[in-house]
Amino acid sequence: YISIFQIGLTAILIISLPLWKQFHKKEYVGQSASGSGNTLPVLTLKQIFQIPGAREILFAFFCYSAVEQTSSLWASSYLVLHLGYSSEKAAGFASLFFIGITVGRGISGFITFKLNDSQMIHLGEGIILIGVLAMIFPFGKTIALTGLILIGLGCAPIYPSIIHSTPAHFGADKSQSIIGVQMAFAYIGTCLMPPFFGIIARSIGITLFPIYLGVFLCIMFFMYETVIKKTHIV
């Protein structure tokens, strides 16, 4: 059934390709008519780092990716080695994190009508903090699992909100280059930080899992607050 569903999605995407071509053609004609079809400048990495707040937003994105990917890859191991669940149950419960992200992204779409990007990011950070604390303190297995869901829910609005806020913080003319580097920093965080926690877990213990997430959450919070101060965009 899963393969049939995936084949169906692929077919829909292929069929819809001509629609995208028509859209871009109309957009190009509209830009040419209005005289606004100029190519945006491509900034070098050095130029991006010189923009006030750019370095901080890159490291904030790096830290977010560290939180999300470490949670997704190490949650089941934490449930087995620290909370004592069987491998089968841990694998099932670890999916709660992804359920949290999925549900959270859907809910975020409606909340954005009321909150701006910075408020969405702060909301996500607050929810992650509650989830991390629920896993740190010995409130029992049920609360720890709830914390895992909350971490997923908190992660949901941050990724899209950081990207969406980039033009407001740095200007539309610079946003294309900055978003490209943001993606690079996100992938670096994704690739490096989960294995780094593996080294910590092997050397010290997997009990540091929620603390590890909390450290990156704090860094992300302070980095984004610095972005707000430097760009004067709340």
Please provide the spans of the model-predicted regions.
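A late C-terminal transmembrane helix in Major Facilitator Superfamily
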Residues: 169-206
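Intracellular juxtamembrane helix-capping segments at the cytosolic ends
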Residues: 157-170
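Symmetry-related core transmembrane helices of the 12-TM Major Facilitator Superfamily/SLC fold
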Residues: 1-19, 210-226
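Helix-to-loop junctions at the C-terminal end of transmembrane segments
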Residues: 105-116, 201-202
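Paired small-residue
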Residues: 131, 142-150
